[in-house]
């Protein structure tokens, strides 16, 4: 495979075209951003760690029947993926109250929700990625009613799988963000990444509200030891996969 030109550069990854029209190369960066890129920094080794975690989780999800854009990982910080047209929605699944849910509703941090909450946010930096109702996103024609139904179903399936997987890692899956895209056959595929950048992860055996954090909240909230937390998550993922296999 030969790499051609840069197609897109986001906050965490650069996408390149290749000599295969339906295959892209995703290069994971060490750059870190928070609060819609108002806070910027760098986490040493983040690109390699997030790519490795995402690669493992995509393969586990594929084995469970969830279709993803993942093909393979030719280098520690690179992933070959199927070219998809990204649906401009950030799909957030919440199992425990935290972050904006607690801030906007008054639900106490750490409250276990009676059932998973699926939310849709408009993927638009200029507007600040606003929370959308189902009717609004249909009005904006960001997706069809059938696609919204399928995405919701997939999101809950993925949540069921990941909750169990992270539990086997000694990690509690508080909430996480997913992105989906359409391939050339208009099939919905799970895209983007699954990593400490996109998941809120708490160490199951740690009660202290700061020490338990194993995700990008360590960067957002200046808790320190960000690299160590990311590396610990990767090690637990690799161990869980080895045991499972």
Swiss-Prot record:
Keyword Isomerase listed? The answer is: no
For this protein, the record's Pfam families field holds: SAICAR_synt
Which pathway does the protein contribute to? Purine metabolism; IMP biosynthesis via de novo pathway; 5-amino-1-(5-phospho-D-ribosyl)imidazole-4-carboxamide from 5-amino-1-(5-phospho-D-ribosyl)imidazole-4-carboxylate: step 1/2
* NCBIfam families named in the record: purC (TIGR00081)
Question: What family is this protein classified in?
Answer: Belongs to the SAICAR synthetase family.
Please name the HAMAP family in this protein's record: SAICAR_synth (MF_00137)
Species name: Nostoc sp. (strain PCC 7120 / SAG 25.82 / UTEX 2576)
Name of the protein in its database record: Phosphoribosylaminoimidazole-succinocarboxamide synthase
From the UniProt record, list the reaction(s) this protein catalyses. 5-amino-1-(5-phospho-D-ribosyl)imidazole-4-carboxylate + L-aspartate + ATP = (2S)-2-[5-amino-1-(5-phospho-beta-D-ribosyl)imidazole-4-carboxamido]succinate + ADP + phosphate + 2 H(+)
Which Gene Ontology BP annotations are present? 'de novo' IMP biosynthetic process; cobalamin biosynthetic process
| Presence of the UniProt keyword Acetylation in the record | no
Q: Which lineage is the organism of this entry classified under, starting from the top rank? A: Bacteria, Bacillati, Cyanobacteriota, Cyanophyceae, Nostocales
A GO molecular-function descriptor: phosphoribosylaminoimidazolesuccinocarboxamide synthase activity
Question: What keywords were assigned to this record?
Answer: ATP-binding, Ligase, Nucleotide-binding, Purine biosynthesis
Listed EC numbers? 6.3.2.6
């Amino acid at each position: 495979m030969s790499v051609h030109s840069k197609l897109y550069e986001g906050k965490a990854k650069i996408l390149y075209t290749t000599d295969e029209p339906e295959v892209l190369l995703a290069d994971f960066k060490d750059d870190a951003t928070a609060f819609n890129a108002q806070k910027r920094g760098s986490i040493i080794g983040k690109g390699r760690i997030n790519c490795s975690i995402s690669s493992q989780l995509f393969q586990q999800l594929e084995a469970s029947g969830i279709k993803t854009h993942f093909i393979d990982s030719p280098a520690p910080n690179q992933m070959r993926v199927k070219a998809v047209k990204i649906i401009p929605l950030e799909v957030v699944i919440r199992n425990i109250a935290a972050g904006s849910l607690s801030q906007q509703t008054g639900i106490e941090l750490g409250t276990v929700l009676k059932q998973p909450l699926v939310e849709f946010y408009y993927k638009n930096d200029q507007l600040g990625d606003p929370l959308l109702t189902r009717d609004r996103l249909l009005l904006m024609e960001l997706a069809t009613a059938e696609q919204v139904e399928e995405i919701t179903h997939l999101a809950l399936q993925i949540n069921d799988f990941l909750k169990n997987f992270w539990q086997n890692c000694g990690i509690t899956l508080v909430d996480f963000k997913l992105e989906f895209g359409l391939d050339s056959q208009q099939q919905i595929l799970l895209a983007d990444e699954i990593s400490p950048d996109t998941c809120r992860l708490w160490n199951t055996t740690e009660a202290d509200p700061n020490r338990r954090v194993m995700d990008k909240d360590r960067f957002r909230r200046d808790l320190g030891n960000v690299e160590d937390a990311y590396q610990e998550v990767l090690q637990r993922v690799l161990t869980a996969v080895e045991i499972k296999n």
